[in-house]
Every structure is written in C-alpha cells, then in structure tokens.
C-alpha cells in the first residue's frame, strides 16, 4: 500500500465511511484473483458509495487507460457481490482515479481524474 492509499483510507474513515482497502476480488479457479481494488468506501448517512484508485506511477496513458479500465470494471462487477453484498446493486458507484498529473485529460477509462 502506498502512502497515498493510506491517506485516502484515513480520510474516508475519519469522514464516517465504512472503508475497505486493497481488497482482492474475483477468485480464479486456478488460484489467485482477477483484480485488487484499492479503496472502496460507503457512507451510511448519505448512502454515498465511492471506489478510488490512486496511482503515483509514470506509465504511458495507454497503459494507464488499460489498467484503470480493468480496475473500474472489476469494481462494478464485484463491489456488490463481494465487498458490500448488503447494498442494492442498482446503487450508483462513484469511481475516481487519483493521479499526480493529468495533462489536459479529465477522464480515464470513462471516469473522473483528481490530481494531488
């Protein structure tokens, strides 16, 4: 876990969210997991569900696009099945990539980018 993930985890926990971090999802038959979701948090009071994927990498945008697409798709597929199965599957999931820079981009894998 990076220091960025730790700060995000602490922030959402402090705000009263139920937070899961570094959660492996999609157990594979031959062993291992399909993906790991970095931060998934739910606030009972306002019913806000958020999936955050922080990254401080220096990969190309095409590589990042591929990686974030896989993580966000896995989030939509598994959050209601494996992480918070007691939530209604029709609830909206806010998905955000947290990066150190974004250039002129506003989205990655169709989701919002926030820079630190």
What label would you give each PLM region?
Residues 1-116:
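Intrinsically disordered, low-complexity Ser/Thr/Pro/Gly-rich regulatory segments
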